[in-house]
Amino acid sequence: MEFGLSEDQVMLQETVRRFVAEEVSLDLVRQIAEGEIQVAETLAEKLTALGLDGLLVPEKDGGSGLGVLDAALVQECFGYGIVPARFLSNSVAAYALRDSGSSILNDIANND
């Protein structure tokens, strides 16, 4: 039985860590905390481009179709970098809705 991360999970973790290091400065966190909506929207667009909004959304609904462990790895990286994003709430909503046949899953996956 294998208890380590898969190669894909390690790659996901490294990608998110690199993104956080390069894109999420303390100044950016402060700007968003102070209500800079455009800064928050730009960050959200970048996270969508990485495919993180649809991490737990099934592929048939426009997402990545990954699992809860993958989402936990992303959240861990976000926590380390104090990333002010709605990743966790969107992920929980997507996970709850994934078997419902809801058309909103595609909207979650595409940050709509």
Predicted regions and their residues:
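Intrinsic disorder at enzyme termini
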Residues: 1-8
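A structural signal for short hydrophobic/aromatic patches embedded in well-ordered alpha helices
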Residues: 12-13, 74
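Glycine-rich flavin
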Residues: 21-112
